[in-house]
Design a protein with these regions (language model features):
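Terminal substrate-recognition subdomain of acyl/acetyltransferases
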Residues: 1-30, 36-42, 69-127
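A short, internal acetyl-CoA/4′-phosphopantetheine-binding micro-motif in the GNAT/acyltransferase core
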Residues: 48-56
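Conserved acetyl-CoA-binding loop-helix of GNAT-fold acetyltransferases
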Residues: 56-69
């Protein structure tokens, strides 16, 4: 296992500033996410995954809650992420995110080169 970070002259391929955040339970990695922070304006959480045996037990909620606390402490004001249709209700109703407007998504893509994936809804939360 490892954490890789690669800077590139191509903006869409620049992985500088990416971090891996994880939640462990008794030495076992349970939930992980990739995080990229753009100064104090915005942080992006494009990928989150939980081991199958630990799904539907609040592990993602715990990871995101702790991540939000850390981001607030360093002055980050907004967290954005792409939500797949099946999990959109979790992100919005349960975790307090809101779907972004198309113009907000376009603006964010231009300013910060955030990742969005086909078939997902970009969501944001003010911290």
């Amino acid at each position: 296992p490892g954490v890789f970070n690669q800077e590139s002259g191509l903006r869409r391929l620049n992985f500088r500033g990416y971090y891996v955040v994880g939640l462990e339970k008794v030495g076992e990695l349970i939930t992980v996410g990739t995080l990229r922070v753009f100064g104090n304006q915005v942080a992006e959480l494009p990928l989150v995954g939980t081991r199958f045996a630990h799904r539907r037990q609040g592990m993602c909620r715990l990871l995101v809650t702790e991540l939000e606390k850390m981001l607030r402490q360093v002055g980050v004001r907004r967290l954005v992420l792409p939500a797949v249709p099946e999990l959109l209700p979790m992100w919005t109703a349960s975790l307090g995110f809101h779907a972004m407007t198309r113009s907000d998504v376009m603006e964010m893509a231009v300013e910060h080169a955030i990742l969005s994936f086909k078939g997902t809804t970009m969501c944001q939360k003010t911290l």
